[in-house]
Amino acid sequence: MLVSRIPCALVVLTLPLPLAAQQAGGARETAEEFVAKLGGRSGAVTIRDGLATLQVPETFRYIGPDAARRLLTEGWGNPADASEGVLGMLYPADVSPLDSGSWAVVISYDEDGYVDDADAESIDYAKLLKQMQDAAASEDAARRKAGYGTVRLVGWAAPPRYSRETHKLYWAKELDFSGEPEHTLNYNVRVLGRQGVLVLNAVASMPALPQIEESMQAVIGFVDFNEGHRYADYVAGTDKKAAYGIAGLVAGAMAAKAGFFKLLWVGILAFKKLIIAGVAAAAIGARRLFSRQKPAAPPASA
């Protein structure tokens, strides 16, 4: 789930109290006790056996894989298999992750290989958006047949931006789920490395965009691969190379989200607390498409 793969998408619900705070013996723990046991911390945090380091400021809290799984399942009511591959979570230090207005970032690792960024400056993001919108629309029939509502990709809430200096990519999408009064924000961050990509995702309602964008920009700044795993450490001809570039990375994230939402239960967005973690199998097809078909149109202004 934000995963070392095959990744799965996660849906995180905001609930006033942890679902499984009522334990087998009948004893209950308070929300404060539940959160305290998660062990949220700031400072330098190393993830996945030295793969990367997060320099977590005092304004955030990080929880590790086990605590993240507990929060996702017991606290927010996700099925147990939904947290497979989670490397941890980040949430604002000044808000309990169990509060109705809280949000969090789920972290995973996609070990598809080194992503060549040669196409970064030639991508027409307006054209790519249209392709993603068409792909999302094509899924609607399957969603309706399965008894779920439709999802429309409205547009970029923040257009994709990639830094060749830091090898970090971010973008945000505005989504319209049928029957929901507010549009949904899906904020994506990808950090490119030697053998894969760190995946950080947050989902909230569109009115939260200013807050989420400011916070995610901070997150982008304190997440980095460690020496030996960095983008610059790639050894051509020896290390695995991903079958897609930057365009496929962006399009693949939409495919993962669209494919997953076919399986969602009705009314989930009423909780306004979704976090998509990782890239699901549905993303693979989109990535393969973009590995064969590079955008030829001139780049759109960001």
Model-based region annotation:
Residues 7-18:
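Bacterial N-terminal signal peptides
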Residues 176-242:
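Extracytoplasmic/lumenal ectodomains and periplasmic regions of secretory and membrane proteins
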Residues 242-299:
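C-terminal single-pass membrane-anchor helix
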Residues 23-53, 65-185, 228, 245-251, ...:
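Conserved polar/disulfide-associated segments of primarily extracytoplasmic proteins
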Residues 58-64, 220-224:
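Short conserved aromatic/hydrophobic patches within beta-strands of well-structured domains
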Residues 2-9, 273-276:
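Sec-dependent signal peptide recognition
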Residues 57, 110, 174, 201-204:
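Active-site-proximal beta-strand/loop segments in catalytic clefts of secreted hydrolases
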Residues 42-55, 207-218:
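Short aromatic-glycine motifs in intrinsically disordered, low-complexity regions
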